[in-house]
Every structure is written in C-alpha cells, then in structure tokens.
Amino acid sequence: MGRVGVLLLNLGGPDRLEDVRPFLFNLFSDPEIIRLPVPWLQKPLAWLISTLRSRKSQENYLQIGGGSPLRKITEAQAEALEKRLEEIGHSVQVYIGMRYWHPFTEEAIARIKRDRIQKLVILPLYPQFSISTSGSSFRVLEEIWKQDPSLKQIEYSLIPSWYDNPGYLEAMADLISQELGQYSNPDTVHIFFSAHGVPQSYVDEAGDPYQKEIEECTRLIMKTLNRPNDYTLAYQSRVGPVEWLKPYTEDALKELGEQGIKEILVIPISFVSEHIETLQEIDIEYREVAEEAGIDHFQRVPALNTHPIFIDSLAQLVINSLTENSYTFEEITRPKKNMKMYPQERWEWGMTTAAEVWNGRLAMIGFIALLIELISGHGPLHFVGLL
C-alpha cells in the first residue's frame, strides 16, 4: 500500500487576539460562507466585515482566554488517532489542515508531499456534511490537486460525513450519560441539542444535506442513549436577518422556560472540539438566556475532544476507508444530485477585454459604496445586519 497518511480537516481559529481580524477576513472571503451574486464584492465585503467585527470578536475570545483552543485540541486528536492506529497495527502519519487559519490546508499538503505519502485518507472533523464546512474544504483540496500535477500520484479517499458511525454515537451517548448522572433525577432532565446553523436557503435552494443529517444524528444519539428524556434540537450562531434553520437556540431556550422546564443538559451536536461556539456562545451567552427564562440548572456536555471511544471510531473510519471505494473531489463538489456549491466560474472576470473593463469599473463603484457606508454608518449592509 505504501506510505499512508490521514488528513484531518477543520475550521481553524485565531490563536491570539491579533489573529482575530485576519481569521475573520479569511472566513468571510469564502463564497461558501457568504454567497454573493457578484463575486468581485467578496474580498471588499470580507475586509469590511472583519474590520468592523474584529473588536467584538476579540472581546468574545478574551472571555475564553484570549484565543481559540481549537488548534491545540485538534493536534491532540491527531496525536491520539495516530497512536490508536499504531496500536491496532497501522503505521499512519496524521496531518492537520485548517480552512481559515494555521496550519492551513495548503501547509498540510506541502508536508504530505515532503513525506512522500502514497495513500491519503481525508477525514473532516465535521460529523455532518455541509456545503459551508466539509464542502468548502473539499473544494480547496480539489483546486490544489488541479494546480499540482504531482499530487495525482497520491491515491486519496474521502469520508464526506460520519454522523451515523456507531462509535461516534456511542461516544456521544457516553458523555451524555456521565453528565446526566450528576442530576438528582436524570430521567426528567430536558436534553437540548444545539447545532451550528446555516441559512435556510442552503437547504432549500442549494440542496445542502446538513439539516437532514443533523436531525438523523440527533435521533440516532437518543436511540443509542436509550433513556426516556424529552429532547429538543435547535440551531445556534445565526448572523444577519435572513432566515436560518429553526428553531433558533435562544428562542427554544425561552420557550422551554415558559413551559416550566427547570433543568436542561446542552449537547453541542455539531462540534467535536471545544472552541468559541461552545465555550463562549453556549457556556456564557445561552446560559444567560436560560437563566433569564427561569431555567435553574443549565449544564453542557463537553465536546468529544480526545474521548477514547471517539478516537477509536475515527481509527475505524480510517481503516475502512483504506479498503472501500471512495468518492472523488468532483463527486462531492459537483454532485449529480440536487446540491449546488458555489459555481467557480463566477470568479472569472470575463472573456473579453471589454468585460474585464466593465467588471473593474463596477468593482470600484461597489468598493466606494462600501467605504461610504463604513464612514456614514448607514446603508444596505447595516440594514441586513452584516455590519
């Protein structure tokens, strides 16, 4: 089989407060995060949003220690996975590729080439597939493969999602059981699954399978848990006025409070590592919402991090991927079924000189409009909630 590598894909996060603005710029520069009908606005808009949002984001990161722990946790996961694979007889080198901050995916591929890896398993640390997470990372890898002919020598296999993996479900159920054991009457605790949201249009118009996979994952976790508790699934991290997947976490918490629910256990279902959405958004912001709603006991299940059952489940995914037929990048980023990722041809400036000139003029007009809005504090971007 030759030298085998595993590439773990994740979002990335700012290590220090000074990293927050460039991290946000990278995030909002991704057309799978903000879909614009005119792509020449992507970079100016990303610059504007990252500039205006950086101070508030820095305050949030300051509440959790001044930076994201995601890189260190992902490195620990990679080390644990490599060790577990070695224990069961597989010599594998594990790499980390982050989408929006160091170590970037491009850096990981450079190390993979240097180490002369011949077989590569690409494993996103997102249990459920979304255009905006795994899909975006797969798109980057597809472009890297196109631009570097030497990578064609590497046989790769993709794992699009693994929300229904038995080991993953068992690890989640184990964490939930441990936390329920701290309540005096665990069977009456309301279990609250909070998933990262996406715009409703991603599901309705682009065919993103994320909502379906989240809902099925929730059902499977409860089946594996095998307890009588009532439960709710809601979606967090909404940005702007457009409709996202519902119910929203803050609204669902308020509704539970109105129903007289006093004890809830929050499950961060789409996160396998602690980061800003768990440590700050859930632990601080949503805790305040719950307390104001009259919920007396608000507790959260920790992220999986390096839970032994979870790491073993990742190892089994890798082993299975080495022997099974795999998807290609194109099958994921350009599927025949009704799923539409952002068309890359929209990034082309035009086929003629005249087209390029007019696009350039329009880009300049758009950029000037953004600057005017930045100075005045009024305009369409403020109206829709992006600024």
Swiss-Prot record:
InterPro entries: Ferrochelatase, Ferrochelatase_AS, Ferrochelatase_C, Ferrochelatase_N. Pathway: Porphyrin-containing compound metabolism; protoheme biosynthesis; protoheme from protoporphyrin-IX: step 1/1. It is an enzyme of class 4 (lyase). Fe cation binds at residues 196, 277. It catalyses: heme b + 2 H(+) = protoporphyrin IX + Fe(2+). It is found in: Cytoplasm. Keywords: Cytoplasm, Heme biosynthesis, Iron, Lyase, Metal-binding, Porphyrin biosynthesis. GO terms for cellular component: cytoplasm. Its main location: cytoplasm. One of its GO terms (molecular function) is metal ion binding. It comes from the Bacteria. Transmembrane segments: none annotated. One of its GO terms (biological process) is heme biosynthetic process. Its EC number is 4.98.1.1. CDD domains: Ferrochelatase_C, Ferrochelatase_N. NCBIfam families: hemH. Catalyzes the ferrous insertion into protoporphyrin IX. PANTHER family: FERROCHELATASE, FERROCHELATASE, MITOCHONDRIAL. Belongs to the ferrochelatase family. This is Ferrochelatase. It comes from Gloeothece citriformis (strain PCC 7424). The gene is hemH.
